[in-house]
């Protein structure tokens, strides 16, 4: 990573399904960002219903690879920007929208990505915000006024 972002970070790792006793703090690689993505240094994250369902083994966890990082409602500061990102700047304070549309199906093309046929969620389909950093699509962040 560039710009002072460390190669590794601390994260709260889900090691198996169960209760809080299956969570462990560990050192993992800081997520890379791709084109159209940003890296957010997490300042706050909620414990959502999706997090508790995933942790307990309920819900759609078939493809979950362990260890996993929960936390589907993070907020923080943008510290790295991927190619093609123009609406977000380094240092922006942002809140992250957890649902990620595919941008290809009919609802997404109509601007209704919450009805996406291939909807993914931060903290479920990709690592979430119970970590020092989280990578997310730039379209999923909203600036927090200062």
Where are these regions (language model features)?
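N-terminal Sec signal peptide and the immediately downstream disordered periplasmic leader
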Residues: 1-3, 36
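Glycine-rich beta-strand-centered segment in the early N-terminal region that forms part
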Residues: 29-46, 58-106, 140, 145
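NAD(P)H dinucleotide-binding glycine-rich loop of Rossmann-like/cofactor-binding domains
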Residues: 100-146
